[in-house]
Swiss-Prot record:
Keyword Oxidoreductase: no
Function summary: Mannosyltransferase involved in glycosylphosphatidylinositol-anchor biosynthesis. Transfers the third mannose to Man2-GlcN-acyl-PI during GPI precursor assembly.
Species this protein is from: Candida albicans (strain SC5314 / ATCC MYA-2876) (Yeast)
Protein name, UniProt field: GPI mannosyltransferase 3
Enzyme class: transferase
Molecular function terms, GO-annotated: alpha-1,2-mannosyltransferase activity
Disulfide bonds: none
Amino acid sequence: MTKSTVLSSYKLFAFIFIFRLANSFAIETFFQADEFFQALEPAHHFVYGYGYLTWEWKQQLRSAIHPLIYVLGYKLVGDNTTLVCISPKVINALIAAIGEYNLYKFIIVYDSEKLAWITLMLSLFNPFNWYVITRSFSNNLEMVFTVLALRFWPWNKKINGRWYISLGFGFVSCIIRPTNILIWIPLGIWLLISIRITLKWVALSFLEVVLILLINTALDYYFYQKLTFPLYNFLEFNVFKNLSIFYGTAPWHFYIFQAIPLMLMLYLPLMIYGLKKNILLLTGLFYIIGFSLIQHKEFRFIYPIHPILLYFTARGYVKFKPKFVLIGILLNICIGLFFTNVHERGVIDLTKYLATQQTPSVGFITPCHSTPWQSYFHNPNLDTNSWFLACEPPLHLNKPSMEEIRHYRDQSDQFYDAPESFLQTHLGKDLPKTEQLVVFEPLEPLMNDYLGREYYECQRFYNSFFHWDSRRDGDIIVYCRN
């Protein structure tokens, strides 16, 4: 590699990083609770000693790799509230830039530099990426490690040092999310039938996996302060006990007719047009079929194959008329701006408002985890005198049936089953009467009728024109105590 090539690579990475840094700071909306409660809250709790730990972290289901990245950021910025909010945004931009830079490098190795440039540009202007890639989801980190592994994968069917780099990145992606193994099963079979297997190769690969497992165990021990094996705990909860269905089920075709169209938006026709029968197509199909068999489904669960979808989109792009593609890209930009700056912005506006007001206590009468917590507030007092409705799963059940799951009611369910009765039973008792209460617009009549003498509306934020969860429709409202 020449000096000019290295310089060009640095410039490209710097451009992508600056682009994603702007993207990260431009996001003013809420997507899903895991962005805050499965990475930032555990990291905040680890560094500062307070923050909300969901049951997954109490049960040690998650690898420490993801939150430890944010631990580094928090340790660097110290106790400054503004920097506590900013540091994850910078880290997320860096993670995204690493992913997209290596997507470009992967396509050069797999196909051509021309297609690599097109894939990168399509990735940068993809609205789902603009909406998701700089958020603190473990699926994003999983996707980045997947792309890194694909970049170094032995596509030329020759085993050398690149294989061991690929194996390392691929195995870490499976540690972060064990279901990522669905990508490596077809690729692994393809490799095994394409190369000459030697004892040295098997032994060195095995030793590398063992070494990574030992390092990961040490990281988990450091984070949890006890010897634990999150990979086993994850399998016990999701497979052996089958408790993941508590968080909802979706039809088998969810990923085909909902997730992929959402992830690609107006790129979808290009992706279909660019499909080619090869190992990447087989890998993508195997991954989607595997995830379709799992009852609990979410859009971001198939995010690790998004780079593969973009590769096929790029193939479709080179066959299509550029002017129509340009119109699609411009419309995609509008869609991305709507979801990052308009839809569900009230939740973030509310959190910023409460943080700047230094409210002494607040109660959230909302579906569980509807707002960020200490990763935005950074206020130890709120941990002791504030609350929100919880939604712990039925950990006492072992392989529950759908009927048992339907009959189990968490705290949030109990409230929405009978709001007034719940408030009569709990408010002012196990749920203290706080200085402020937060509700979504559908509960406005309840607040006015039942608590109108004690609380008055003191602030209101637009949140959404529509929402998949009717409990979160409309504005989000702050009530202050008289």
